[in-house]
Amino acid sequence: MVADASQQGQSNGAAFNQQQQYQQQQQRQLFGGEEEFGDEEELGDDVDLVVGDYSAAFAGEAGAEVDEAQAAALAAAHAQAQQQAQAAALAAVPDQIRKYVVLFNQAVQINNVQDISNAYEGTWNRLTDKFYARSEWPEAETIAPLVNDDQKFLTLYRELWYRHVYSRLSPDGEDRFHSYDNYCDFFNFVLNSDGPVQLELPAQWLWDIIDEFIYQFQSFSQWRNKVSNKSEDEIALLQDGGVWSSYSVLNVLYSLIQKSRITEQLVAASKGEDPDEVAGEFGSKPLYRMLGYFSIIGLLRVHVLLGDYTLALKMLDHIELNKKSGLINRVTACHVTAYYYVGFAYLMLRRYPDCIKSFTHILVFIMRLRQYHTRSYQYDQINKTADRMYALLSMACALCPTRLDENIQTQMRDKYGDQFSKMTRPGAEGLAAFEELFIYACPKFITANSPAYHDEEALVEYKQKAVFPDPTQHQLRVFLSDVKTQLSNANVRSFLRLYTTLGTDKLASFLEIDEEELVEMMMVMKNSTRSLKWSSGSLLHGQVVNTSDLDFVIDTDMVHIAESRVGRRYGDWFLRNGTRMHDVLNNIQAKPLPIVSKQVQDEAAAAAAEAKDAKDKKVKNAWAAGVKAGPPAFSQRSGGAGRSSVNKSAPAPAGAWGSSKPQPSVTA
């Protein structure tokens, strides 16, 4: 009986081991084998439900019952094996990486912002290029013994770890879900504490956290909508719609704004009051103040991605973009991002003058920045954004002819000169140029609603669609609807440019249409060339202006035309280039003279002495030849008939041959 019981226990243990191995294999496929950490409350309760549901399903498949003693023994053995595996993995980590992690953790613990900034912006990228350019960094569980399992640092480390996976590698479904869990842990740590957390991070890192959080939300939304290449495990994960949902992302950003009271601080600053008086306990801390401020810019971006351009601009009611001393200028990437999305929102709202002004301002800033900012790890990303803004600027200028800065005009012509010339012509060629630049330069739009992964029948029906809904194509159609209206009026403009006054009957005969149809066409044309232009106040405020270089008024049956051509400012051109030449000369004069070695100096001196000797010798030989030839013929005396006919009373020749007073030379 004892032997039978022992054999039965061994068979049960083997079955349980097989069950555990199968369960771990499935979890690695679904979640990457990472364990949940921390007991903080999650922003979305559904995050923890995924693991629990699948664990229950796996246990049900095995159907094995194990008593508590055996389960405890197996758990202890599993923990020991896991510790041994982690120790082996830690031993494989290079010494330079381990030292970096220890020093990085020490800087975070003592809130040394300067050391954190150096470790984050400089050392991390250098070590990545050296050790992990095409592979993952060590997992947080591997380096946990080096930092005494400090969850605060491990959460920050995981944020960098997943960002590296997104930027250098290709994230899979489990990476996307685990990254969301980690962001939930971080934001719960910041938002749900009884008081301000004892953590200080550089402004650049805080902006990157918000920026990366929105980027991963955007990436997940696009990945989620591609239902054709999803496995069954990924579909099971995606049935939980709370992960990376629009509601959860917006909830985080609005919560950070509310917690930091950044809106109240900005209002107080605009009135000349002290922002610290209204900041409160949390808003007075740099961590909360900067996270709240960057969340405003983040909401601008999210609302543009969702296609709500009016609400996007509404988010910046209390931010002065043109203020040089504002918080927006502390981080270059934040500054560029804000202007990019503001300019694009203006473009989609048909406010072309404001769009051109926004893009011109930030492109001039980037142009001046390039000579100082090449060391930044974000330099390439800023340049890519600048190229996209040049494309959007060329579209806005094609729809609203405007005088631009000479440097911006030159750059835009060099990059998109061919497309710009096409966009000014009506027809399919012009529309194709607009479409090409829009697809290239627009943001990666997302949809708030996901496919029905929870409904199998609806999902099958969704997969059978020939064309899946694409938010980018939808926004393109919205934009091109206005472009088509403006391009269709090109024929009317060509006739109006030839006259200052023209009868409607005559113009209708030119176009071969009725007068009523002509008046309707001209009213559509006039409306399409009217737009708001910001002058002060909120970004949504503005005055109605004409966006075309041609304007007209219809008085009964007569059309009065006024054309305003964009002229070139020659005075500004000369002033700008004169100042540039002056700066170049000052720069050249300020540079030190080149240091020449002693050997080169000696060689140059010897060559100069040799050249001087040769020159002196040549002069001496010429002098000797002149003396040997004798005096000039006109100074020689000869008797008789052969005597010279030179006038004796004439003055003697100058120089050594005659008077000491210099005289004009005479031909010998």
From Swiss-Prot:
Q: Name one GO biological process term.
A: translational initiation
Location of this chain's protein in the cell? Cytoplasm
Q: Which residues form the signal peptide?
A: none
Q: Where is the composition biased (Acidic residues)?
A: 33-42
Feature: compositional bias, Low complexity: 18-32, 648-662
Gene Ontology cellular component terms for the protein in this record: eukaryotic 43S preinitiation complex; eukaryotic 48S preinitiation complex; eukaryotic translation initiation factor 3 complex
Report domain PCI positions. Answer: 358-552
Q: Which UniProt keywords apply?
A: Cytoplasm, Initiation factor, Protein biosynthesis
Polar residues: bias regions = 1-17
Record region (Disordered): 1-42, 625-668
The record's annotation in InterPro entries points to: eIF3l (IPR019382), PCI_dom (IPR000717)
One molecular function GO term is:
translation initiation factor activity
Q: How does it assemble?
A: Component of the eukaryotic translation initiation factor 3 (eIF-3) complex.
Q: State the function annotated in the UniProt record.
A: Component of the eukaryotic translation initiation factor 3 (eIF-3) complex, which is involved in protein synthesis of a specialized repertoire of mRNAs and, together with other initiation factors, stimulates binding of mRNA and methionyl-tRNAi to the 40S ribosome. The eIF-3 complex specifically targets and initiates translation of a subset of mRNAs involved in cell proliferation.
Q: Which family does it belong to?
A: Belongs to the eIF-3 subunit L family.
This chain's protein is named Eukaryotic translation initiation factor 3 subunit L
Q: Which organism is it from?
A: Mycosarcoma maydis (Corn smut fungus)
